[in-house]
Regions:
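Histidine-centered, transition-metal-coordinating active-site segments
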Residues: 1-203
């Protein structure tokens, strides 16, 4: 497994001899972007992200160790770039998406703080591993357990934990968890000036 991980890291860092592989996994036209654009378009009901990814892949070729696109695929590439831009404004940077992400990060951060203090929290085995262990990038590289638990994590682990945490005695954790479950999200306020200290205290 470590050999496969080393190979994947080499490709991702563009240290592997076949340079076009890096472009396939980390570039403006990488496979992940093609995949999530179609997937997110489907699940959000935003038609702008519905691109012809199969046609784009079919039009790709390798020239001098770099990915190239056949001339007849240019319009498909233009459509992909425009679709991605529209998806960012309509979905990824939408105020509800931003608020949800911020609340989830804050909820997990609070859970981690409590766990490291020794507070007992409900969590699946995979989620528990990350809550009760100080994890850094080095451990991801060196620890098979870390990678294995990360692979086991999915949405169900998080949502189940949030439901249980919504009744926890810690006010911060329970409030954030209930907000996520009941969709009572943070409000987004756009301003051109810096937030004053008084406004921060009010919030």
């Amino acid at each position: 497994m470590k050999g496969q991980l080393n190979l994947a890291i080499q490709i991702f860092k563009d240290e592997y001899p076949k340079k076009f592989l890096h472009q396939l996994v980390s570039g403006q036209l990488d496979m992940d972007r093609l995949d999530y654009l179609r997937r997110d378009s489907f699940y959000t009901g935003v038609s702008e992200g519905n691109i012809g990814s199969a046609r784009i892949i079919k039009m790709l070729d390798v020239k001098d160790d770099h990915l190239v696109v056949e001339s007849k695929g240019i319009y498909s590439i233009e459509n992909f770039l425009m679709s991605r831009r529209l998806m960012y404004w309509q979905v990824y940077l939408h105020k509800t998406s931003v608020a949800s992400e911020k609340m989830l990060v804050n909820t997990l951060t609070r859970a981690k703080e409590l766990a490291l203090r020794g507070v007992e929290l409900f969590a699946s085995p995979a989620l528990r591993f990350f809550l009760y262990h100080p994890i850094d990038k080095k451990e991801f590289y060196n620890s098979p357990d870390c990678l294995e638990n990360f692979i086991q994590l999915d949405d169900n682990d998080i949502w189940t934990a949030l439901k249980v945490w919504s009744n926890h005695s810690d006010v911060v954790l329970s409030t954030l968890s209930r907000g996520m479950i009941n969709r009572k999200l943070f409000k987004v306020e756009v301003t051109s000036s810096s937030i004053t200290k008084a406004r921060k205290e009010e919030i």
